[in-house]
């Protein structure tokens, strides 16, 4: 799998060089992490860094870090502000609907690519849930959102209050469950939560990894054990809403997303599929 993925990255980069040199944005999937967040172990490449390999070929690469268990809406909003800069704003209407903090005070970014606009577009590569997140970002960029349905009062955020067409040149998804997956049922119900995350906890240590749910007013306490942290997260009310990864990745959740996330005529779409057997 790693060899296939590496080959794809190289071929894709060569094709990009033949046409343009727009930045490449990498969006991780469910339970993923950003650059340097797990020491020398990379989400994109493991012991190697695919991002650095692409950079060596002359391309600009941005590796984002969005909520590992958050919904695609929340992840897409975070992706926008990490690139463009500013304080994350999940939207007035969305925040009230799900009782989350609209503008978390700790989520303010300088911007990896502040000049991002229709004249300076990007290519996005999303792995697993990251492919859904990329499509959600394109959707949010292409629409105007209003604080209340039936009114003409627009959202005040830079992202949601106006349209931003042709900001994305291409979206490539790798192993993305665009139609949902039954795996989420296994993760959230069949397999105990602690068992599922114990491998992650063993790799990253006690303070290295954060589930980034500050907008749900949830964070690891000082000197809190991993076991207690995970148990509290397991019981959090967020899992009972539609504003969470388990819903977006489910069959019903993905179907609901697909009703909104229509393909744009201005974007090139590529999908790399994989399969596995027991």
Functional labels for PLM-detected ranges:
Residues 18-176, 180-195:
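N-terminal non-catalytic accessory region
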Residues 1-4, 190:
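Structural motif marking the loop-to-transmembrane transition
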Residues 16, 58, 209-211:
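Intrinsic-disorder/low-complexity regions
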Residues 139-278:
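Helical cap/lid subdomain of alpha/beta-hydrolase-fold lipid enzymes
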Residues 9-12, 84, 233:
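Generic alpha-helical secondary structure signal
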Residues 3-15:
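Sec-dependent N-terminal signal peptides
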């Amino acid at each position: 799998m790693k060899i296939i993925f590496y080959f794809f990255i190289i071929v894709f980069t060569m094709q990009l060089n033949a046409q343009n040199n727009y930045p490449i944005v990498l969006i991780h999937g469910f339970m993923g992490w950003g650059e340097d967040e797990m020491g020398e172990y990379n989400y994109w490449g493991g012991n190697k860094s695919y991002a650095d390999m692409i950079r060596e070929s002359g391309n600009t690469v941005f590796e984002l870090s969005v909520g590992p268990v958050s919904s695609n809406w929340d992840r897409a909003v975070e992706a926008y502000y990490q690139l463009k800069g500013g304080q994350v704003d999940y939207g007035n209407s969305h925040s009230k609907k799900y009782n989350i903090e609209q503008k978390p005070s700790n989520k303010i970014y300088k911007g990896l690519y502040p000049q991002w606009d229709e004249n300076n577009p990007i290519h996005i590569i999303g792995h697993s849930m990251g492919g859904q997140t990329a499509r959600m970002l394109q959707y949010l960029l292409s629409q105007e959102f209003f604080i209340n349905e039936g009114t003409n009062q627009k959202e005040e955020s830079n992202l949601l209050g106006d349209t931003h067409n042709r900001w994305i040149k291409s979206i490539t998804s790798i192993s993305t469950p665009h139609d949902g997956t039954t795996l989420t049922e296994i993760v959230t119900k069949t397999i105990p939560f602690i068992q599922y995350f114990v491998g992650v906890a063993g790799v990253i240590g006690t303070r290295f990894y954060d589930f980034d749910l500050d907008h749900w007013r949830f964070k690891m306490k000082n000197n809190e054990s991993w076991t207690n942290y995970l148990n509290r997260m397991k019981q959090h009310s967020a899992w009972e809403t539609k504003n969470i990864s388990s819903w977006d990745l489910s069959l019903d959740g993905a179907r609901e997303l697909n009703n909104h996330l229509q393909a744009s005529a201005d974007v090139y779409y590529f999908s790399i599929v994989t399969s596995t057997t027991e």
